[in-house]
């Protein structure tokens, strides 16, 4: 599940700002920013954002005790 906290953590792992995430996910950067500030996302938008993270080797972690992101593998630059 995508949460604002997990999204921020994943962006941090990748060194991405909201504009970079928006471009990678094919959504407006303002949508990314608004979500992190409490506005809900459509399911389809959340799926695009999660796919962009997965493409970079980042998995989101959300359970009862923790929220964040882990880097499962790193893509080589230019790959």
Residue ranges and their predicted role:
Residues 20, 31, 45:
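Residues in the helix-turn-helix
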Residues 26-41:
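Recognition helix of helix-turn-helix/homeodomain-like DNA-binding domains
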Residues 5-20:
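Short basic helix-loop element that most often maps to the first helix and adjoining turn
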Residues 58-79:
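Helix-turn-helix/homeodomain-like alpha-helical modules used for DNA recognition
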Residues 26, 43-61:
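DNA major-groove recognition helix of helix-turn-helix/homeodomain DNA-binding modules
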Residues 9, 23, 34, 51:
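DNA-binding alpha-helical recognition surfaces that contact promoter or target DNA
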């Amino acid at each position: 599940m995508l949460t604002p906290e997990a999204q921020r953590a994943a962006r941090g792992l990748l060194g991405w700002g909201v504009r970079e995430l928006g471009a990678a996910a094919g959504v407006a950067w303002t949508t990314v920013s608004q979500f992190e500030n409490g506005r809900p996302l459509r399911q389809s938008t959340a799926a695009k954002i999660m796919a962009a993270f997965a493409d970079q080797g980042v998995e989101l972690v959300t359970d009862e005790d923790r929220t964040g992101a882990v880097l499962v593998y790193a893509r080589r630059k230019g790959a």
